[in-house]
């Protein structure tokens, strides 16, 4: 859901006929490693964001106009489907030419960067999820990051599979060192809260760790600041 909000904000327009939509009017590339991207859900999220913007401005918007904005914005999104580790690597290497030819591409999103970890663990004896993720992030940093404003990827938490508590993992020196080594600016870990209908986002940078509460609704994630 959060990844969808990043994409929606990126590809929606900043303004539409004097109404502030609060998008970025940029292009995004989504690498789908699981084949689970649902464009219908992304379109529904964008629809709610547009309607909310118009309601805030006190303006009624015809359904046809909403659909027009959504469909036009979706033209700014390219989805790349991958089926295995080789295809993922080829896609990352091929993106450099595309980014050079289109300056509007501001976001690269990958869901999920660890999709083929188990395949590579069997074939090449890669032991750790962090080790595998690090190899892909190196490619992104070397060939893509200089042309793209933001790279966002989802991943499983290795500590969760080892029955470690998320808080311990998040605040550990090992995790902080890993952020610095991989060149990751922020690590977001989403988890449930003890409060009904509330969730917690743990945000870690190299120098700081904090928690932000949030709720989930049809309009996406709402931060409780």
Task: Explain the meaning of each model-derived region.
Residues 44-49, 98, 204-207:
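Conserved AAA+ ATPase "sensor/coupling" helix adjacent to the nucleotide-binding pocket
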Residues 130-134, 138-225:
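Phosphate-binding/switch region of NTP-binding enzymes
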Residues 79-146:
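Phosphate-binding/switch loop-helix module in NTP-utilizing enzymes
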Residues 1-93:
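Conserved P-loop
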Residues 27, 75-76, 103-107, 145-155:
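Loop/turn-to-beta-strand initiation segments
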Residues 14-23, 69-72, 98-102, 142-147, ...:
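Conserved catalytic network of the ASCE P-loop NTPase/AAA+ motor domain
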Residues 34-38, 83-88, 114-115, 157-161, ...:
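Conserved nucleotide-binding/hydrolysis micro-motifs of P-loop NTPases
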Residues 41, 89-90, 119-121, 162-166, ...:
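Short, well-ordered secondary-structure micro-motifs
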């Amino acid at each position: 859901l959060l990844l969808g909000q990043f994409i929606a904000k990126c590809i929606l327009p900043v303004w539409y006929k004097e109404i502030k939509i609060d998008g970025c009017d940029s292009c995004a590339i989504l690498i789908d490693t699981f084949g689970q991207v649902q464009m219908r859900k992304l379109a529904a999220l964008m629809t709610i964001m547009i309607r909310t913007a118009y309601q805030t401005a006190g303006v009624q918007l015809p359904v046809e106009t909403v659909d027009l904005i959504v469909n036009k914005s979706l033209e700014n999104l390219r989805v790349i489907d991958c089926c295995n580790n080789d295809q993922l690597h080829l896609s990352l290497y091929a993106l450099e030419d595309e980014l050079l030819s289109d300056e509007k591409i501001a976001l690269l999103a990958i869901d999920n960067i660890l999709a083929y970890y188990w395949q590579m663990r069997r074939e090449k004896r890669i032991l750790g999820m962090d080790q595998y993720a690090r190899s892909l992030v190196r490619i992104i940093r070397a060939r893509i990051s200089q042309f793209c404003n933001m790279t966002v990827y989802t991943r499983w938490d290795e500590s969760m599979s080892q029955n470690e508590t998320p808080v311990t993992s998040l605040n550990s020196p090992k995790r902080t060192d890993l952020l610095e080594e991989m060149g990751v600016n922020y690590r977001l870990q989403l988890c449930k809260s003890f409060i009904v209908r509330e969730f917690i986002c743990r945000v870690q940078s190299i120098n700081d760790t904090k928690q932000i509460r949030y709720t989930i609704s049809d309009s996406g994630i709402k931060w409780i600041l």
